[in-house]
Amino acid sequence: MQRVGSSLPSGSQSASQCPSVAFTERNQVATLPVQRLTEDAAAVRDNVHTEDGFQMKLYAHGFTPEELLVQVNSGCLVVTGQRQLEGCNPDGTGFRVAQKVHQQMSLPPDLDPAAMTCCLTPSGQLCVRGQCRALPPSEAQTGPASRFRSRGSKKLA
């Protein structure tokens, strides 16, 4: 199991059920592993905010999973990547190309960081997905929708 480095005592870390993600109790930082896919997934289409989950797509063509760092930090998703290509032209002159990528965005407050996944498609699409936590039974029954319905059914005198 990988653990995210922390200056907290070892008793302050809790292991996640996801074998490659660990969180510290105080600052909630997690590094997500980037899985390389062998084919483009049909599910990787657009950035999506849904009621039960989250998906973000980023163009990262040319990067390998090892060159990308995907982290969840205090309710934000942060993706960074850096790579360098060096070579020599036929005329003997050298070249160096540096490429960087950086994307940061806020995550839904009820998103479960331990259930997030990250994959890189052959076409260079980095896709990060996550599911929202289930509401406790008491909140699910008395959620905002049920409260609004009960108010709307009252008759005014």
UniProtKB/Swiss-Prot annotation:
Residues 148-157 have a biased composition (Basic residues). It is found in: Cytoplasm; Nucleus. GO terms for cellular component: cytoplasm; cytosol; nucleoplasm; nucleus. The keyword Glycoprotein does not apply. Residues 1-20, 136-157 are annotated as: Disordered. Residues 1-17 have a biased composition (Low complexity). Its main location: cytoplasm. Keywords: Cytoplasm, Nucleus, Stress response. Residues 35-148 form the sHSP domain. It holds the Pfam family HSP20. InterPro entries: A-crystallin/Hsp20_dom, HSP20-like_chaperone, HSPB9. Belongs to the small heat shock protein (HSP20) family. This is Heat shock protein beta-9.
